[in-house]
């Protein structure tokens, strides 16, 4: 499913990092996705599952400060599903622009993430949209495709380092 939207991202052995660390180092380039982050994989899989369900949502809403919002925006636009993303005041402007560029309605509310999250729940009721948490099962299944690609290409790894924010990247591993 993910590869119907974009091809597998590359992974390369990095000689300079390998030399500096004293071991073989491979880097998986998730910056080659349409949103420059692995999270988009989860949005694609989640929205596909929701649209195939007995009761597809009329829209999605979520609070975030980053790539989760881009993921839902991109996948929602591809599926023709409206997406509203709520971010707190002072959120990174590059993230805000990216979320909007992928087609989501951006709402800026509250001084911190929790205030933005609470506002998203209020808007969920008003709009009749489905709320999306950043660690839902289908999101994690989609995110896991990065690990599948990596392990299909490099199968003798001792250690894997993964960025951890809300946890979908490590959960997908």
What positions do the PLM features span?
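PLP-dependent amino-acid enzyme catalytic core
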Residues: 1-173
């Amino acid at each position: 499913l993910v590869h119907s939207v974009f091809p597998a991202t590359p992974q390369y052995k990095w000689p300079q990092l390998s030399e500096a660390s004293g071991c073989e180092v491979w880097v998986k380039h998730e910056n080659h996705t349409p949103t420059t982050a692995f999270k988009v994989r989860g949005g694609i899989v989640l929205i596909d599952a929701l649209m195939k369900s007995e009761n597809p949502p009329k829209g999605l809403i979520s609070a975030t400060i980053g790539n989760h919002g881009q993921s839902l925006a991109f996948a929602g636009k591809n599926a023709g599903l409206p997406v509203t993303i709520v971010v707190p005041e002072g959120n990174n402007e590059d993230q805000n622009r990216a979320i909007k560029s992928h087609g989501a309605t951006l709402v800026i509310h509250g001084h911190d993430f929790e205030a933005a999250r609470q506002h998203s729940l209020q808007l969920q009721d008003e709009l009749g949209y489905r709320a999306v948490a950043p660690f839902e099962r289908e999101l994690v299944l989609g995110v896991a495709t990065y690990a599948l690609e990596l392990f299909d290409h490099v199968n003798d790894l001792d250690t894997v380092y993964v960025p951890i924010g809300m946890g979908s990247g490590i959960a997908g591993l």
